[in-house]
Amino acid sequence: MKNILVPTDFSKNCNKAEELGIEMAKLYNSEIHFFHLMKTPVEWVKLDKQKEKQYPETVKQIGLAKAYLSELEKKAERQGLECRTFLEFDGGQANILKHSGHFHHDFIVTGSSGTRGGIRELMGSNVEKIVRKADVPVVIVKDEEVSFPFKDIVFVSDFLQDVSDAFKQVISIAEKCGAHIHLLRVNTHTDFNSIEKGLDPIKKF
């Protein structure tokens, strides 16, 4: 793991994600990127300095965001990490995924207060879409405290499709953290499987 991305809206759970990202970067000796996405009343990147003055509240918010990102950069650097910060405007989830792909991040860590919480405003879309579309593992930090290194990792799958690549990533993380891996297959009400039959794909896996 060489590069970790931490999208943040500076909320409480994103603060916890920032801390987790730093701890992971320390363990892996990775570079860490903090990314903040702002909604603006107009297409901000096309405004000149004179027109920006027409939106004093937005200018203030941008200043606060830059200051917070600067503090995050200093915090990471005090831990001996290489760090970069990014502030972008609008664009939604595409900006997050495009940024991650451009910089070849190996991992994404961010925070959410729920499916309709801060992550929705941060990414302009539901967090599940980010999880589904990202090409790298994503950790979403919610209200519970997160301890790191991880002690237990649950790998959830129907085990009917080829999930070997994803499982290799889980093994790599578990080995680095010294964590136990638990395999979980959920029997839904449409499966009509007995417990034993439901376990068969896991045993074959």
State what each model feature region is.
Residues 13, 67, 71-108:
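Structural beta-alpha unit
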Residues 53-67:
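A short acidic, glycine-rich active-site loop
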Residues 37, 113-114, 143-145, 186-187:
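Short, ordered loop/turn segments at secondary-structure junctions
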Residues 109-112, 137-143:
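Short beta-strand elements of ligand-binding domains
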Residues 1, 104-106, 136, 150:
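Local beta-strand N-terminus motif with an aromatic residue
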Residues 1-52, 152-205:
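Small/aliphatic-rich secondary-structure junction motif
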